[in-house]
Amino acid sequence: MEGAARDFIARFGAPDLVIANAGVSVGTRGDEVADVAKLRRVLEVNVTGLAATLAAFAPAMREAGRGTLAGIASVAGFRGLPGAGAYSASKSAAITWLESLRAELHGSGVAVVCVCPGYIDTPMTRVNRFRMPFLLSADEAARRIVRAIEARRRLAVIPWQMALVSLALRAMPGWLFDRLAARAPREPKDVPV
């Protein structure tokens, strides 16, 4: 990524906008040793890929004193979800990493936007065998993500209904969350990473 960023910057200068949007998901269990390899792969793509993309452009944008760095995380990053521990952990790490980057670039003229979508109709979610509330089409999700980035929102949860759900989940006492999460549907485990 660094080489590609260097080539881009040498040719065009610091970009006005960089969006890091990569993600993989697979059902995992924390109590299965075999799933550690899946965890490693999910973290590599969802966290390291996002960080490497944004970090490659951040110095030039900081030097230019302008621009927006946007990372796509997920509402799944707000609480650990059963059967999706790797995905939840990766998106939680992405949210926290973007928050740290925002603090580091404060006052530089470079905005850092973290977008946390709920369910989007993509090949990745089509394998889910459970109801996905407030499912957005890819086109509608893209429109809402663009609006959030243009507004330079520090944290954008879309759709708004998922923002309410995520607030409720974060405010929920641990003992209650544990009981409800134990009954939640799991991601399919037979999807390759």
Regions found by a protein language model. Name each.
Residues L54, S90:
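Active-site helix of classical SDR
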Residues M1-G13:
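Conserved amphipathic alpha-helix within the SDR
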Residues R79, S100-A111:
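Active-site-adjacent segment of SDR/Rossmann-fold oxidoreductases
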Residues S25-R40, G83:
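Conserved mid-core segment of classical short-chain dehydrogenase/reductases
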Residues G80-S88, S100, N128:
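Active-site loop-to-helix junction immediately N-terminal to the catalytic Tyr of the SDR YXXXK motif
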Residues S74:
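Residue(s) in the substrate-gating loop at a strand-loop-helix junction
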Residues C114, F130-V165:
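C-terminal helical subdomain
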